[in-house]
């Protein structure tokens, strides 16, 4: 194993160029995403990178004992949509990144944030290039295979958020199962809803799979009619949620009495689409989310959801990564608790907050 690592550490961009039969400049353009190299050139470079197990800049950094005091954060960027101005990076991911940044600053670290496109063909190469510039990586969602994570983890420590757990990396997440089960029980037991739908997130997301599995198990145990599957496949975005509902209504499908969305952004799109078709929420269809992003409480009606400690997740991801960088800690996974947040979109009555006497006096209502 040590010999294999030394062999990999000796690799340079020159080896890739030689293996691919292209110039060093061409390899640099492909690896750095610069210019528009020809498709065959890109393919040859990527094949050489794969065959050699090359990690850009990483080996030289791994051989050095110098800590750069920089961690890299990579998230998956959604495709352009009609809701482009509310890309998920502005909601859930932004809050997580804020937690990472605050925790990093306390330790004297800087944060290098980057994104990869959902349909990018060179995700590993892009992430590997970032790995060569930092002391550790935090990856949002599932963007690399277990084999790719293992390869990168030989160069820098890796913590994944809602990603694929591997023996080579650390993971930080929330208790998806408990959150969804409590939500389903609330809808079935407290409201008496007998038909429930699950509008999914990314099909390859471990979080989505955990939530879908918990939903199906709890709804089945309650004897509820279940709506899920291909027709209910979203992508964690408002546009994805809106498109699913619009498609179902256009096809003449009967909507369930309550729709459990994989995240709050999906719920935002669902509520938007239902409002456009004059379907009352929660009077005709109840809608719930997952995350409790800041905007959730300001929707109309306010969104019932499962709150996960989003900013704490980011801070925790940095701390487990920092512990590995600074002290070689072997923490493998951290699961944070969640909380059911009941508002009005599920059908619960609005509970007005009591105003302090000083406020009542100022409004003439005391």
What are these regions (language model features)?
Residues 1-5, 19, 51, 99-109, ...:
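Bacterial carbohydrate/catabolite-sensing allosteric modules
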Residues 1-70, 350, 359-366:
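N-terminal helix-turn-helix DNA-binding module of bacterial transcription factors
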Residues 51-57, 118-122, 140-141, 243, ...:
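Short gly/ser/thr-rich secondary-structure transition/capping motifs
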Residues 55-125:
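Amphipathic helical "hinge" segments at domain boundaries
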Residues 74, 138-140, 260:
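Structural motif
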Residues 80, 145-146, 267-268:
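Short glycine-rich, flexible loops that bind phosphorylated cofactors or substrates
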Residues 122-178:
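Short beta-strand-centered segments that line the small-molecule binding cleft or hinge
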């Amino acid at each position: 194993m040590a010999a294999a690592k030394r062999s990999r550490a000796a690799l340079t961009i020159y080896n890739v160029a030689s293996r691919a039969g292209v110039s060093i400049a061409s390899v640099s353009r492909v690896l750095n995403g610069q210019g528009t190299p020809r498709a065959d050139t890109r393919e040859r470079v990527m094949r050489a990178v794969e065959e050699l197990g090359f990690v850009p800049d990483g080996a030289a950094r791994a051989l050095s004992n110098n800590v750069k005091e920089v961690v890299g954060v990579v998230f998956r960027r959604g495709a352009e949509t009609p809701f482009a101005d509310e890309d998920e990076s502005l909601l859930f991911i932004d809050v997580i990144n804020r937690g990472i940044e605050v925790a990093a600053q306390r330790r004297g670290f800087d944060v290098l944030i980057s994104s990869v496109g959902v349909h990018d063909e060179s995700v590993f190469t892009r992430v590997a290039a970032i790995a060569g510039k930092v002391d550790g990586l935090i990856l949002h969602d599932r963007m690399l295979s277990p084999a790719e994570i293992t390869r990168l983890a030989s160069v820098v420590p890796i913590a994944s958020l809602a990603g694929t757990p591997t023996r080579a990396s650390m993971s930080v997440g929330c208790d998806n199962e408990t959150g969804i089960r409590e939500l389903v029980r609330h809808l079935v037991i407290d409201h008496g809803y007998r038909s429930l739908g699950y509008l999914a997130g990314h099909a390859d997301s471990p979080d989505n799979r955990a939530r879908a599995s918990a939903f199906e198990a709890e709804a089945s145990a309650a004897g509820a009619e279940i709506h899920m599957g291909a027709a209910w496949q979203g992508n964690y975005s408002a546009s994805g949620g809106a498109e699913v509902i619009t498609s179902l209504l256009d096809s003449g499908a009967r909507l369930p009495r309550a729709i459990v969305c994989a995240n709050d952004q999906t719920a935002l799109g669902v509520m938007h689409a239902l409002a456009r078709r004059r379907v009352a929420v929660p009077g005709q269809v109840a809608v719930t989310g997952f995350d409790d992003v800041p905007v959730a409480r300001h929707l109309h009606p306010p969104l019932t959801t499962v709150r996960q400690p989003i900013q704490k997740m980011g801070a925790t991801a940095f701390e487990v990564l920092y512990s590995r960088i600074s002290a070689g800690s072997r923490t493998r996974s951290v699961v944070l608790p969640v909380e059911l947040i009941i508002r009005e979109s599920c059908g619960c009555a609005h509970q007005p907050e009591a105003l302090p006497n000083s406020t009542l006096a100022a409004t003439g209502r005391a």
